[in-house]
Each structure stands twice: as structure tokens, then as C-alpha cells.
Amino acid sequence: MQTRNAFSYIKEEITRSISVLLVIYIIIRAPISNAYPIFAQQGYENPREATGRIVCANCHLANKPVDIEVPQTVLPDTVFEAVVRIPYDMQVKQVLANGKRGALNVGAVLILPEGFELAPTDRISPEIKEKMGNLSFQSYRPTKKNILVVGPVPGQKYSEITFPILSPDPATNRDVNFLKYPIYVGGNRGRGQIYPDGSKSNNNVYNATTSGIINKIIRKDKGGYEITIVDASDGREVIDIIPPGPELLVSEGESIKLDQPLTSNPNVGGFGQGDAEIVLQDPLRVQGLLFFLASIIFAQIFLVLKKKQFEKVQLSEMNF
């Protein structure tokens, strides 16, 4: 009986320990996951809205350029490069989550036509692998292999990202035709201003939540500020919390208005989107074009030879 109770007690303790460890893991792991742009895709079934806007712009509010380079035409079942460039000043530093300054990271989303997908590793040439570096690409959804995401990765090393793409073959995929297709791209540099849950990051401007007089500013030990504002209308005290990172622009005793910036804008990054076009070319059409061009060349050569032969005949008749 005592042995059975001992085993029961041990079983309960093991179960309780596992539960505690699982809860601790979830608590610690969740903020880290939410910090990565790739996890924001859980909120959107498709990264490109009906208006053409890519949803990454909901978190990265500043508008910045992005460029994409793809071949004009590709043949079926071939691997080609889609090069995405995310330019920015390599000298600038961004505000990190802890308020310190650090290098910018970059990320990108590539929306390909249906049927196009990430090339298998065994189909990628050594030249393309060298350009790819150590990047790891993922599908936006398991069912959407034509939408690829990457990042965040160090911007100083990967401001130019090479995607290895495999073109579809209409002979094996009846949903694909030999047509001109659009390709859409979105690229960001630096941290966003809004988290996926809608809360503001410290990479943001913080404004006054009321108008009045700044009564007190407390600098916190771990960084950031606690600003007490005496409301001008009823005299009540309103406390605005500023996280570590943004620089304070106001001082005690200063009169401020509603929505007046209390801090500078620390954001040095931003998001941009662009597009390109690619033609999935029919090999038979290419062969037909080559045959047509070759026939024209041979016809021209034949005419030149005939002309010279005619001139020789005329010259011989004149001499006769």
C-alpha cells in the first residue's frame, strides 16, 4: 500500500514539474517569437491585400525603397534568380528592444505566380548557392509554396537577397500556361513600429495623451521615463510611460498640447514594395522563332548569291 502511494506521489510530482516547465517555456518563448516578422503571418491568410498593399506595412510604417530583378523570360522547369535589394545607410543604428543601439536587420516577402516555388537544393547551382549565403527561406503557408518569406537577417550582410526559384512546367501542371506573370515583393529594414498584437514598440514616437503642464519626469533605472502631466481642464494627473530608446524632447514645467510629441522619432528603417513581370516561354515557340530567323538568313544569303550569279552572267554577255 505504501509502495503504491509512493509511486502515486512521484507520478504527481513529475506531472506537476512538467506542467510548470511547460508554462515557463511558453512565457519565455512567446515574446521572442512575436518579435520576428515571420510570425506576424499568422494574422493574415494572404500577405497581399485586395488593394495591392502588402500587410508588412501595417507594422513597418515608414516608406522606404525596394528593388527586384528577375529575368524577362524563363523556360519551364528551370531554376532562376530573383534578386531583392533593400538599400539603406549602413552607418545608421536602430533602437533595439532593450533601448540600446544596434545594427539593422532586414526581411523580405516574395509573392510569385501560382506554380512557381522555391527551387529544391539539388537543383540549385553552386553559383546561386554562393549568392544565397546562409539564408533560410520558408513558405508563407504550407499550401502557398509560391509565397516565400525570409528574415530577419543582418542587413549589413544581406541587403541583397537572392531567391532561387523553380519555374513550373505546363506539361505536368495544367493550371499553368505560357503567359506573362506579375511578381510582387516587399522588403523591410529595421524593426517595426507596431507589434502583431497591435501594441506599439519602442521604435516609435510617443505623444502626450492629454494637454497640460508637465509636473514631473522620472527616469527609470532600466531606462525610459515616467512623465506626470497635470491636465489643463480638470487638474487631474495623467502619467505617460516612455519605454527605453526614444530621446525625450520635453522638460518639467513645460506646457504641452494633446498628441504633442514627447520624444524624437528613433525609427531609421522602413518598408517598401515593388513588382516585376516574367514570361514563361514555350520552348517550341523559341524553336519556331529560331527556325524563322534562320530561314530569313538563308533566304538573304540565297538572294545575294543569285544576284552575284546574275551579275556574272551579264558581265560575260557584255564581253561576248
Curated annotation (Swiss-Prot):
GO MF, one annotated term: heme binding
Entry-linked InterPro entries: Cyt-f_TM, Cyt_f, Cyt_f_lg_dom, Cyt_f_lg_dom_sf, Rudment_hybrid_motif
Localization per Swiss-Prot or TrEMBL: Plastid, Chloroplast thylakoid membrane
Cofactor note (record): Binds 1 heme group covalently.
Membrane topology classification: Single-pass membrane protein
GO biological process per UniProt: photosynthesis
Main subcellular location of this protein, as a coarse class: plastid
Name by which UniProt lists this protein: Cytochrome f
Organism: Lotus japonicus (Lotus corniculatus var. japonicus)
